[in-house]
């Protein structure tokens, strides 16, 4: 009998010892989940069917050269008008953004050129988005002559900083572009690789601008809040899965 009592007591002790840590672990996990801030939700900037949320830079509806097909927003550049497209033009988001993480997939036609411009100040003072907003270059590196110019290749912070690594895919394939701007800290990411990192609105930033083609544009790279623009550079370009997250 004494041996049975001993075994019962020992068994209960072991059961208690085994269950207690599990309870603590579960509690710790619950606290961790509760105390972790929830990330801001992604906001879709393109529903795959309409131009809702976009307009032509300077006002008005999106031009007819911009089209939607198979969930893609693309520029039909068949009708040339100088360096841009007839009834095309740059398009911008209706909404402005300050601290954000922007994503889109892009695909360029052979010999094509385009860009994603951000922190754009849309006003009558400026004729084009690139007069105020920095640009992540979209380019056919193998076919377009701009690729011969350092800091003009796909993924570069156009005319300011060259990518530290070339990760662009061959023409006709989809590339994932990301722009992360947070309190002046800027990261450009192409196909999962951080290709440009810099800090805006510092003396070093001003020096970059002073040594670029934007040096005589007083509003360039100055605005801390603005629109996202997709550029019409007169070439066919496709975009899809366009979204943004406020930081």
Question: What are these language model-derived features?
Answer:
Residues 2-9:
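Sec-dependent signal peptide recognition
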Residues 9-15:
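Bacterial N-terminal signal peptides
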Residues 18-247:
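Carbohydrate-interacting regions of secretory-pathway proteins
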């Amino acid at each position: 009998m004494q041996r049975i009592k001993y075994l019962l007591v020992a068994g209960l002790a072991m059961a208690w010892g085994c269950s207690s840590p599990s309870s603590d672990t579960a509690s710790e996990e619950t606290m961790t989940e509760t105390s972790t801030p929830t990330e801001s939700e992604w906001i879709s900037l393109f529903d795959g069917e309409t131009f809702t949320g976009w307009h032509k830079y300077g006002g008005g509806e999106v031009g007819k050269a911009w089209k939607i097909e198979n969930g893609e927003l693309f520029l039909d550049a068949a009708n040339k008008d100088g360096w841009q497209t007839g009834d095309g033009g740059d398009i911008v988001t209706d909404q402005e953004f300050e601290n954000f993480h922007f994503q889109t997939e892009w695909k360029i036609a052979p010999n094509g050129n385009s860009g994603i411009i951000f922190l754009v100040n849309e006003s009558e003072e400026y004729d084009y988005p690139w007069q105020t907003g920095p640009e992540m270059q979209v380019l056919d590196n193998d076919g377009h002559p701009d690729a011969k110019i350092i800091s003009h290749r796909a993924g570069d912070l156009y005319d300011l900083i060259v990518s530290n690594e070339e990760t662009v895919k061959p023409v006709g394939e989809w590339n994932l572009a990301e722009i992360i701007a947070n309190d002046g800290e800027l990261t450009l990411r192409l196909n999962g690789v951080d290709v440009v990192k810099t800090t805006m609105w510092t003396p070093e930033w001003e020096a970059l601008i002073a040594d670029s083609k934007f040096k005589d544009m007083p509003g360039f790279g100055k605005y801390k809040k603005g629109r996202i623009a997709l550029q019409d550079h007169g070439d066919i370009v496709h975009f899809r899965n366009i979204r943004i997250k406020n930081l």
